[in-house]
Amino acid sequence: MFRQKFLSKDFITKIIEKAAGKVTRIMLEDFLSCIEKETALHYFTKSSESNLLRIIQNQFDIAFFINECLKYPHQIEILITLSNNSNYLTDILVRNPEYFHWIINPSVLEQKINGKYFKENLEKTVAPFKSIESKVNAIRNFKRKEILRIGLKDIYLKEELKNITLYLSFLANSISAILFELCYKEILNKHN
C-alpha cells in the first residue's frame, strides 16, 4: 500500500457526519489537524485510515472523545500507532470502545505485569459468575483487554520483544490454568 500524505475526503466527511452538532467546527478542525499532523509521522496508508475511522466511528460519545483527544495529545498518538500497526488491536477497540479510555491511562499502559497479576485478576474476573458460559465469556473479555495492553506495550512503548513474549506467556498460562480448573469442576459436577 502507498503512503497517504493527507486524510481522504471520505474520511473527513464521515468524521464530520459523526460529529455534526456535537462539537464546534473549530474543535473538529483542530481534531482533524492533530490527526493529520500525527499521521505525517507514520507510514499511514488507506488501510490505516480505514482502521482509524472504524475506531472513531464506534466511540460511544464522539464529543467527549474529540475533547479528550484535543486535551491529551498522546491519545491521538496511540490511536494512530494502533490503527497503523494492527488490524487485530483495531478490531478489539471497535468491538470494545470502552477499552480505549482504560488503555490511554499511563498507569495502565506502563504497569508492570507478571504471572501473579494475571492469575489474581483473572480469578477476580470470573468469581462473580455462576455458569461456565458466563465465566468463559469473562475470560474472553479479559484476554482481549490484556492483549490490547500487551500489544500497545509493544508498538507504542517499544518494550523489548523478550518482555512482550513473557507477558503473552503469562497471560496464556493464566488463561489455560483457569480454563482447566473450570473444565475439571464441570466434569466433576456432571459425574457426581
What name fits each language-model region?
Residues 1-192:
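Non-catalytic regulatory/linker segments of enzymes
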